[in-house]
Every structure is written in structure tokens, then in C-alpha cells.
Swiss-Prot record:
Database matches in InterPro entries: HDAC_interact_dom (IPR013194), PAH (IPR003822), PAH_sf (IPR036600), Sin3-like (IPR039774), Sin3_C (IPR031693)
Bias (Polar residues) ranges: 18-30, 1123-1139
Ranges of residues in domain PAH: 28-109, 123-193
Highest taxon, organism lineage: Eukaryota
A GO molecular-function annotation: transcription corepressor activity
Region (Disordered): 1-37, 702-727, 743-779, 803-830, 1121-1143
Residue(s) carrying Phosphoserine: 817
Protein name: Paired amphipathic helix protein Sin3-like 5
Name of encoding gene: SNL5
Cellular component GO terms held in the UniProt record: nucleus
Subcellular location, record wording: Nucleus
Length: 1162
């Protein structure tokens, strides 16, 4: 099909210009129709001629582009027909077929004629043209070095050996058989030769390529080459670049002459061709040059035919990421209009490499769409400013010229050279002003300047006013574009952050992150253990800092607001209950007890008792006997409020009995006193082992001490049995952790408090230290508690708090089954009518998990740190803490950056963080969309606000996860275990016990150790992997065969007679005499220290022994000090004399040796 389509256009091509190859120019040109006739020409003819020109100059694109430029100038009437003919003849000089083909398109009366072949002089060959031809050959055969080297070898053999020009042509014809254009161009460098090769020569017929009918280049017509080569030597190498007037100069001659001038050939030979055989005659002896490539100007010009953008500048010198130095052999073009100042300041060797969005090798941030808008505005502004400036400059020049004409400084009669008065920029401005008629106006200006200048000046001023108004109008548009896109243009990370954030917030991503960190840390520990011999470190895998405690309040308000707006009441209750009873106490946040009702009571007391201290009113009420019978330190009801940490449905007021109104009122008064003293005593919290204790704890602890009675049951140390054999002294309450049990006193004890005020609630020693105490007493209590009074913080829990009174196993099992079957009517109410907090309800179903732990533990295993809280959890609870940390980190980032921007000198906003929180609330309740929220964040915080764009998704995911944790059975058990472990005394809390209990719950699941330090406000999370926390399996039974080997062979006793000698006899004789071997043994072991700590494992199946790492035996003896001798004794005098004599001999030998060396010196 392709062949058919080609034949369709044969007829138009035959009517159009017929173009032959460059090789035909040396022979008889083909018949070309033309000579000034334009009849029958079509667009196909013009395209065919253009294609022929393009194919002819496929290695020289500049000529083709120059030809197109000539045609464009002719179309624009910049040049006439004669000018076109002159430029085309000069451009296509030597290409007769193209010149004759161009006649077809000339009008009548115009024709390009050629000189007869005999009279036409030989085209001079330029050295630069020869170099370009060699480079084209090298570029054409870039993938085949063999062909290029073969071509160089042919030239070298022609220069050095007996090879005629005929043979050179035949070999080059074989080499360029598929590249007729190169072969035709090679002929131009050869001298005229005749009679050497016949057309009927078999070699020539075999190598001649038949021409395709549509091929632009016909087959080459060989000629006979037989002529003496004339060479002329020049003193300077630069003269070789000039055009040669001698037609016999060729490529081979230039190559040889160039090498000769550079001193590569010591004796330059004269080459003569006699009867077809070249004879080399050397003036001073000639040696074969080993490497023709030593001439850099000829063969090493790798960059001659390459543009700068095609150069590989990777290995070149680098100044900045954008600038590279050109290679030393790259030709530098000589500027036309450079003066001395330009020579000093302008750069010719450093070029700017491609960078930015087009080149990804240079890591440069790509422009976003908002930056593109700003850049377009800048381009428009620049263009308009340039237009206005060019018009203003042209107006000044035209006015100046008109003034000279009007003043007769310049005569109108004489022709005016416009270019002497107007610059090229001014003329280009005038030409652009008139558009398509610009050239006509320029011609008229040159011919009649005094007439055209006033009209042009008026037009310039009109255009100046028009463009000035346009710029004023566009400035409003540009200002809107800048205001709309400025902040967005600075944000390059939000797009990628949004894509990655969903993966980072997933449970799978968070777990994979800490696993990867833990594995890397384990490998580093192993390498460190091998290199240094240290034991693996048990430091957290990840750590997070909570520097701003006020952010916890913002988080609470945020979660509470979201739950009220989105979640149902039941879900909201569970989420907020978990928040205020577990998460906040874990981070050391004080208990939130302020409510709306309490604030109302404060207002009433302030109105009725202006002159009485609120603490005295509370004291009188608490000391009233009528109030003692109803003494129940209950938690006041919580109402929904943004300032209140509890929400409706999550308070414990709904679990209270109906007849507890007086107790509620009593607690209100307690809270009133705490609130009224809040300003005068801002620090109401004192640090204990795991948290901060409120000041009213001692009151409740003493009340509970009364309720304990004699319910103490002894148990083994370390045994975990909270329901049956729990030693009550091992547990205490910490209010900050939400672990405050509220106990109802037995009736007999309440009556005792009424009759015996010294031991009751209002007694002198056992008085309840409530928040209603006077300010001075309150300060003293705070001071005592801060000094570490341990008794002020203990609250001993009765046996009923752990599931009832101490009973037998049957009763315990019965009670347990009854609770499991029927449940409890009120989850907050105990069996004896007492009420429990959230943590106490966790403690009720707790049972012993690990059977037994060692009774004696090392001190390091006991958590004695008073400022940290430890929690063991699973994947779900780890993700909960990570989501909390991410939310905290982003809110803190917003607070920091907003405050930083507010403190900036150019800032006008004084409450940026509040504005941000309002925008976030609007986003959560749906009154604002994400786009508006992002714009407000960028305006408030700046470019760092990209991390806040997904806050709504993070809050939503966090609340869902909180609800999932509250509803999950395994997570609930872990929370119960945490509450149970936190009831221990400081000296009775063991990390290893807690860990084993958690492992008993989770089995093969991942266990995370989460620890928060209040002193450092640091949260550390460690994945307890199998290599650092898996307890070793203890063997229960031993196989009989292995037991026999272990007892009879490995641990067998060897008698003294069978033992080999451990000491040499001569050494034993020094320490003991005959019959005193035991005495000698004891003397030998004096001062010797032996430490046996090597451990090993023995495989029962193979009896192989494996020594444990980091264990070893050590034997060493301390160096004994020399005994001080008596200086006056005879033995000491004798010893000192001998030592002095020995010292003098050594000195004498040293001087003798030194003298000998000095004498031997020259």
C-alpha cells in the first residue's frame, strides 16, 4: 500500500522541480524544467522542493533555516526578487541542482544561470568545513566505531603508504555505500582525477547503489583521479582556517599539513604522484606516527557540531546548582559588538544548565497552580511595563529628532539617517505599533522623515495613554490574584501530606512504624553487644514530649464538642468517661471537678457570707453532728459545659441513690471551698508515686482506716490475689489517676464518730482535711504533703472493694457466678451499699492472673519512681496513645505558630489561636467547609499550617477509636488491670508483675509498655518483643537418659586421687613443706578473687552445651604493695649499696656507647 501511495505523486513531482544530489554537481547536471515559468505549479511542487533542500542539508540545519528565512523575508517584502536570487545563489553555491530547481518558482524575466563546467573554478575548501565533515562522519557512525576508524586509516594510508587517490575513492565508496550524501560530500575534498576508474569497472559496478525513483540523491558518477597534490605550508596554524585559493587543496592535505605545523611529524614529506604511484620522500627520515588522533584540532573536537543545550556538562566544573563551565575545547563564539567593558564583566565560559520542572535530575520544587498564577501576573506586569518604557523612550527620541528638524539643526533637503537618531529598540517599537503595516511605515519614515515623525509621535502618545489606563485597570485584577493565591502558593506540602496522612493514621501503619523502629534498635543492640559486650538496652522505641499542659484542656474541649455535635448520647458518655478517667490521669492532668451547679453555689455563698471565709462555713457544716450520719464524700454531678470535663450522661450523679441529697450538698460545699481558694493558692496538687493527690485525700483515707477493722489477711509477697488473699496494705488510692474509691462507713462506726469527736470526722487528730480549711492551715497541709508525708496520701481499701468480704473459696466462687449471671443492679454500688468510682468498678472483676511470682525481687525491678505512670497495652491501646499524641502535636503546632506570627512586627492580629480554634469548631459542626478552613489556617498560621488540614479526619478517627476501646472486652480488662496495679503502695508496685499479668491476658499479641514521666513530660512507648521480654520456659520433667548423663557424667564428682596436678611441685615447695599441702593451697589462693558467672544451656536431645552471652568466669589477684624496709637495718644498707653500684655501671655503659657513636659521626 505504501508503494501505491508513493506512485500517486509521481506526476506532480515530474511537473515540479527535479532535484539531483550534490554529487551530480560535479558531473553533468540533470535536465530541469524552469526558466521563469510558473504555470502548473502546485503546493506539492513547493513542498517537494523544500523536502529536497532539507534532505540535502540534513547535517547542516543552519542553511535550511537560512533558506526559510529568505523566503519569509521575500513574503514580507523585505527583499525584492533580485535580492532573493543573490542570496539563494550564495546559499546554494556548489549545489547546481538546487539552483536550477529554484528557477521553477521565479517569475518571468528572472533566471539563475550557471557557468560552464570548463570555466567554473574549483570551489575553495575551508579547513573548518573539513573539520565539520569529519565530525559529521563521526556522529553518523557513533554506534559503529569500526567504520570511523576505518575511514581514518584510509586517510592515514593515503598519506603514508603507496595508495593512489583511485584506491582511496574505491575504499571510501565501499565504506559509505549506505550513505550517499557523505560520499558525495567527500568528492568535494578530492582533486580532479581522470581515467583511473571506468564506469564498466567491476569493482565500481559492485559498489554503485541504484537510485530509487523517489530518492532525492541519484547514484554517484565516479571519475578518474590522477593529479599531483599541491601543498603549501604556512607558519601560523590560524591561517589554515582561511579559504584556500588553490583548487587542489583537499581534506587529506589539510590533515597532513595541520599535523606537520604542530610538530607531530619531524620531517614533513613531500608527496608526488608519478604514474599512479605515490612516492614518499622525506627530508630527514620519516617514522610512522603511532596515533593519528594526537591532533586535537582535527580529531578531538567532540563539541564542534553540538549546541550548548546538547552538551553533557555533568563532569564539568560547577559553580552553583545552576551553572557549569563549558569544556576547554568548546569553541567560544566571538561577539560582534563587545567593547573593553564587556570583556571585563561579561561571561563566556559559564552556562546555566536546565533546572526546574523540566529537569528532574536537579531536585527543585515544582511550581503549583497558585504559583503559576502569580508568575503569569508577573509576566503580564513585566510585559506591560516594558511596553510603556519602550514607548516612553521612543517618544523622547522622536521629540528630540523633531526638535532638531524644527530648529533647522537637521536639514530636510538632505536624507536623514534614522538609525543615527533612533535605536533599534525605538524602531522596533514603532514597527510593533503599526502591526502588519509596520514595514511600510518604516520605509516611509526612511524616505520622508519630516512628514512621518509628527504622525508617529501622536500615535506613540495615544498608545502610551491607552497602555497606562490598561495598567491601572489591571492592577486591581492583579491585586485580587495576589491576595487569593499568595498563601496557597507557599504551600507545597499539603497535597502530598493529605495523601500520606490517611496511611499514617491507620492502625496498620502505626504498628508497622514501631515494629520497624524496634527491629532496627534490636539489631543495633546486637551489634553493640558483639562489639563492646554490653547488654541490650531497654529504652523506649519512640518518645514524645508534652511541653504545654494547657493543650490538654483544649483537647478535652475539642473532643467534648465533637461528641456533643456528632455522637449519640450513649457513645458520648463512653468516650468522655474513658477520656477523663484514664487518658487525662495518665498524662497527669488534674481531676476536673468544677461544674455549673458548683459555680452557682459559689455565687450564693459570696452573696450571703461576704465577711466569712468559705472554708469556715464548710468546717461548721462538716463538724455538725447531724451531718456526720450522712458523711459520704461523693462525687458531685457533672453537667455539660465547655469548661467542665464531664458531659451529660457521663457523670456519676445518675448512678447515685435518691436519698443522697444531703451528701451531694455536702460535697458541693467542699468544692466551693476549693474553688474560692483557687486564686490565692493556685497549686493545690502534690506529687506522690504515680500522680498528683488532691488535698482532701487524707480525710477520706482516715475514714477508710476506720472501716478496715481487722480485715487484714497475710499472703506471700508478690502473690496476686485481690479478691481472696490480698494484703490491703499493699494498695492505696491516687485521686489524679481517677482511682478514688468512695466508701460508705458501717453504722456502728458512724455512731462512734458521733460519740467520740476526737476519733470522728471533726476530731483534733482524725479530723477530715477538707478543702474548706483556713488558708493558713491549708498552706501547712500542702507543705507537709509536698515534703513527702506518705501517710497523708494513703487510703486503704477494704476487702469489699475487691468483690466482698474475705470468705472461703466456695463463697467467692458463688458470689462470682452470681455476679456473672445476674449482674449488678447499679454498677457504682457495692454489696454493702457503698459507691465506687470508675476505677473501682474496674477493680471488682479483677482476678489473679499469674499464679505466683518470685517473692524476692531485685530493687531495680520495683518501680520506685514517684513521677511516672506505666501502662501495658495491646495494639489498640497503643494506637489510642499515638492518635492522642498526633492530635496534641498538631494543636500545639497551631498554637506555637499562631503565637509566633502574632509576635511578628508586621502582625495586626492579637488572638490568632482563638481564631484558629473557632475555625476548627466551625469545621467540626459543619458550618464551614474544608476549603474555607484551609484558607483561614494559611492566613492565621502561614505555610506551616498544612498539618492542620486533616484535623477533622483525625478527630473523627480518634473519637471512633475511643469508642472502640471502651466497648472492647480485652481493652477493658487491660484498663482494669491498670487500675488494680495502681492501688499498690509505692514499695509494692513491681513492673515485672504488671508485665506478666498483661502477658497472661494478651498471650501471643503485641505488648506495649507505655510510660509517662510527669517530671520530664515525656511519653515513651516500647514494643516488648520476644527477644527482650519473653520469659524462658522452665523445664518441668527431665528425660531419663539426659538425667543420667547430667548426674553421672557432666556433674560427676572426681576424687582427689584422680585429679591431675594443678600446681608444679617446685611452686608447691616454695609455699609449703612436707605434709603441709593444705597450708600451701591456702597460701596460693591468698588475694585471689574468683567470680563464677558463666551460664550454659544443654540440649536434652543432643547433649550440646551452649554458653549464654554476656556471662563469664573471672579470676584475678590484686597486686600486693611492697613492704616498707627499715632504712637503718643492715639488710637495707646492703641492698642500697648494690643498687647504687648497679646504677653507676649502667651510667658508665651508656656514656661509652654514646662516645662511640659521636666518634663515628663524619
Amino acid at each position: 500500500m505504501k508503494r501505491v501511495r508513493e506512485e500517486v505523486y509521481v506526476e506532480p513531482q515530474m511537473r515540479g522541480p527535479t532535484v539531483s544530489s550534490r554529487g551530480e554537481t560535479n558531473g553533468r547536471p540533470s535536465t530541469i524544467s524552469g526558466g521563469g515559468t510558473t504555470g502548473g505549479l502546485t503546493t506539492v511542487d513547493a513542498l517537494t522542493y523544500l523536502k529536497a533542500v532539507k534532505d540535502m542539508f540534513q547535517d547542516n540545519k543552519e542553511k535550511y533555516e537560512t533558506f526559510l528565512g529568505v523566503m519569509k523575508d521575500f513574503k514580507a517584502q523585505r527583499v525584492d526578487t533580485n535580492g532573493v536570487i543573490a542570496r539563494v545563489k550564495d546559499l546554494f553555491k556548489g549545489y547546481d541542482d538546487l539552483l536550477l530547481g529554484f528557477n521553477t518558482f521565479l517569475p518571468k524575466g528572472y533566471k539563475i544561470t550557471l557557468q560552464p563546467e570548463d570555466e567554473k573554478p574549483k570551489k575553495p575548501v575551508d579547513f573548518q568545513v573539513a573539520i565539520e565533515f569529519v565530525n559529521r562522519i563521526k556522529a553518523r557512525f557513533g554506534g559503529d566505531d569500526r567504520a570511523y576508524k576505518k575511514f581514518l586509516d584510509i586517510l592515514n594510508m593515503y598519506r603514508k603508504e603507496t595508495k593512489s587517490i583511485n584506491e582511496v575513492y574505491q575504499e571510501v565508496t565501499l565504506l559509505f555505500q549506505d550513505h550517499e550524501d557523505l560520499l558525495g560530500e567527500f568528492v568535494h575534498f578530492l582533486p580532479d582525477f581522470r581515467g583511473s576508474v571506468s564506469v564498466n569497472d567491476p569493482l565500481f559496478q559492485r559498489n554503485t547503489i541504484p537510485r530509487d525513483r523517489n530518492s532525492t540523491f541519484p547514484g554517484m558518477h565516479p571519475k578518474h583521479f590522477e593529479k599531483k597534490i599541491k601543498r603549501s605550508r604556512h607558519d601560523e596554524y590560524t591561517e589554515l582556517s582561511d579559504q584556500r585559493e588553490d583548487g587542489d587543496e583537499n581534506l587529506v592535505a589539510y590533515s597532513a599539513e595541520s599535523l606537520a605545523n604542530q610538530g607531530q611529524w619531524p620531517g614533513y614529506p613531500k608527496v608526488e604522484d608519478t604514474e599512479g604511484i605515490q612516492i614518499y620522500e622525506s627530508n630527514g627520515g620519516h617514522e610512522r606516527d603511532p596515533d593519528i588522533g594526537s591532533q586535537k584540532n582535527l580529531l578531538s573536537t567532540n563539541h564542534m557540531a553540538k549546541a550548548i543545550n546538547e552538551l553533557d556538562l555533568t563532569d564539568c566544573a560547577q559553580c552553583t546548582p545552576s551553572y557549569r563551565r563549558l569544556p576547554d575545547d568548546y569553541p567560544i563564539q566571538i561577539p560582534s559588538y563587545r567593547n573593553s567593558l564587556g570583556e571585563k564583566v561579561l561571561n563566556d565560559h559559564w552556562v546555566s544548565v536546565t533546572s526546574g520542572s523540566e529537569d528532574y535530575s536537579f531536585k527543585h520544587m515544582r511550581k503549583n497552580q497558585y504559583e503559576e498564577s502569580l508568575f503569569r501576573c508577573e509576566d503580564d506586569r513585566f510585559e506591560l511595563d516594558m511596553l510603556l518604557e519602550s514607548v516612553s523612550a521612543a517618544i523622547k527620541r522622536v521629540e528630540s529628532l523633531l526638535e532638531k528638524i524644527n530648529n533647522n539643526t537637521i536639514s530636510i533637503e538632505t536624507p536623514i539617517c534614522i538609525r543615527e537618531h533612533l535605536s533599534e529598540l525605538n524602531l522596533r517599537c514603532i514597527e510593533r505599533l503599526y502591526g502588519d503595516y509596520g514595514l511600510d511605515v518604516m520605509d516611509f519614515l526612511k524616505k520622508n522623515s519630516h512628514i512621518a515623525l509628527p504622525v508617529i509621535l501622536t500615535r506613540l502618545k495615544q498608545k502610551q495613554e491607552e497602555w497606562a489606563r490598561c495598567r491601572a485597570d489591571f492592577r486591581k485584577v492583579w491585586a485580587e490574584v495576589y491576595a487569593k493565591n499568595h498563601h496557597k502558593s507557599l504551600d507545597h506540602r499539603s497535597f502530598y501530606f493529605k495523601q500520606q496522612d490517611s496511611k499514617n493514621l491507620s492502625t496498620k501503619g502505626l504498628v508497622a512504624e514501631i515494629k520497624d523502629i524496634s527491629e532496627r534498635k534490636h539489631k543495633e543492640d546486637l551489634l553493640r553487644a558483639i562489639a563492646v559486650g554490653t547488654k541490650p538496652s531497654f529504652t523506649p522505641d519512640v518518645e514524645f514530649i508534652y511541653t504545654d499542659t494547657k493543650v490538654h484542656t483544649d483537647l478535652y474541649k475539642l473532643i467534648k464538642y465533637y461528641c456533643e455535635e456528632i455522637c449519640a448520647t450513649e457513645q458520648s458518655d463512653k468516650v468522655m468517661k474513658l477520656w477523663v478517667t484514664f487518658l487525662e490521669p495518665m498524662f497527669g492532668v488534674p481531676s476536673r471537678s468544677e461544674t455549673i451547679e458548683t459555680m452557682k453555689d459559689v455565687a450564693k455563698i459570696e452573696d450571703n457570707q461576704e465577711h466569712h471565709d468559705a472554708s469556715e462555713a464548710v468546717k461548721e457544716n462538716t463538724c455538725d453532728g447531724s451531718m456526720a450520719s450522712n458523711l459520704k464524700p461523693l462525687t458531685p454531678p457533672k453537667m455539660p459545659n465547655k469548661e467542665n470535663p464531664m458531659i451529660q450522661g457521663s457523670s456519676f450523679a445518675q448512678d447515685l441513690p435518691v436519698n443522697t441529697g444531703e451528701s451531694i450538698q455536702q460535697d458541693k460545699l467542699h468544692d466551693v471551698a476549693a474553688i474560692t481558694n483557687e486564686d490565692s493558692q493556685p497549686s493545690k496538687l502534690v506529687s506522690t508515686r504515680n500522680d498528683l493527690i488532691m488535698e482532701g485525700v487524707e480525710n477520706r483515707s482516715r475514714v477508710s482506716d476506720v472501716s478496715m477493722g481487722g480485715h487484714k489477711v497475710e499472703r506471700e509477697e508478690g502473690e496476686l490475689s485481690p479478691t481472696e488473699s490480698c494484703e490491703q496494705e499493699n494498695f492505696e488510692v491516687y485521686k489524679e489517676n481517677g482511682l478514688e474509691p468512695v466508701q460508705k462507713l458501717p453504722d456502728n462506726e458512724i455512731s462512734n464518730t458521733d460519740r467520740e469527736p476526737k476519733e470522728g470526722a471533726c476530731g483534733t487528730e482524725a479530723v477530715t482535711r477538707s478543702n474548706a480549711l483556713p488558708e493558713d492551715d491549708d498552706n501547712k497541709i500542702t507543705q507537709k504533703l509536698s515534703e513527702g508525708d506518705e501517710n497523708a496520701s494513703k487510703f486503704i481499701v477494704s476487702a469489699s472493694k475487691f468483690g466482698g468480704q474475705v470468705s472461703s473459696d466456695e463463697e467467692h466462687k458463688g458470689a462470682e457466678s452470681e455476679n456473672e449471671a445476674g449482674g449488678m443492679v447499679n454498677s457504682n454500688e457495692g454489696e454493702d451499699g457503698s459507691f465506687f468510682t470508675f476505677s473501682e468498678r474496674y477493680l471488682q472483676p479483677v482476678k489473679p492472673l499469674a499464679k505466683h511470682v518470685p517473692g524476692t525481687l531485685q530493687a531495680s525491678e520495683c518501680d520506685t519512681r514517684n513521677d511516672s505512670r506505666v501502662f501495658y497495652g495491646n495494639d489498640s491501646l497503643y494506637v489510642l496513645f499515638r492518635l492522642h499524641q498526633m492530635l496534641y502535636e498538631r494543636i500545639q503546632s497551631a498554637k506555637i505558630h499562631s503565637e509566633r506570627k502574632w509576635k511578628a512586627p508586621d502582625s495586626t492580629s492579637t488572638d490568632s489561636y482563638t481564631r484558629f480554634m473557632e475555625a476548627l469548631y466551625n469545621l467540626l459542626d459543619g458550618s464551614s467547609d474544608n476549603t474555607k478552613f484551609e484558607d483561614e489556617c494559611r492566613a492565621i498560621i502561614g505555610a506551616q499550617s498544612y498539618v492542620l488540614f486533616t484535623l477533622d479526619k483525625l478527630v473523627q478517627k480518634f473519637v471512633k477509636h475511643l469508642h472502640a476501646v471502651a466497648a472492647d472486652e480485652t481493652d477493658t480488662k487491660l484498663l482494669q488491670l491498670y487500675a488494680y496495679e495502681n492501688y499498690r503502695k509505692p514499695g509494692r508496685f513491681f513492673d515485672i508483675v504488671y508485665h506478666e499479668n498483661a502477658r497472661a491476658l494478651l498471650h501471643d499479641q503485641n505488648i506495649y509498655r507505655i510510660e509517662y514521666s510527669s517530671a520530664q513530660t515525656r511519653l515513651g512507648i516500647q514494643l516488648m518483643n520476644s527477644w527482650n521480654d519473653q520469659p524462658e520456659v522452665t523445664a518441668v520433667t527431665v528425660e531419663p537418659g539426659f538425667a543420667n548423663y547430667l548426674q553421672n557424667d557432666f556433674l560427676s564428682f572426681v576424687s582427689d586421687e584422680e585429679k591431675p596436678g594443678l600446681f608444679l611441685k617446685r611452686n608447691k615447695a616454695k609455699l609449703s613443706g612436707p605434709g603441709e599441702e593444705s597450708l600451701g593451697m591456702s597460701r596460693a589462693l591468698e588475694g585471689l578473687n574468683i567470680i563464677n558467672e558463666v551460664e550454659c544451656k544443654i540440649a536434652c536431645s543432643s547433649f550440646k552445651v551452649k554458653y549464654e552471652p554476656h556471662t563469664a568466669d573471672l579470676l584475678y589477684r590484686r597486686k600486693q604493695k611492697k613492704a616498707t624496709l627499715n632504712p637503718t637495718g643492715p639488710e637495707n644498707v646492703k641492698t642500697s649499696d648494690s643498687s647504687e653500684l648497679s646504677r653507676k655501671k649502667r651510667i658508665s655503659r651508656f656514656h661509652m656507647s654514646l662516645n662511640r657513636r659521636l666518634v663515628a659521626l663524619p
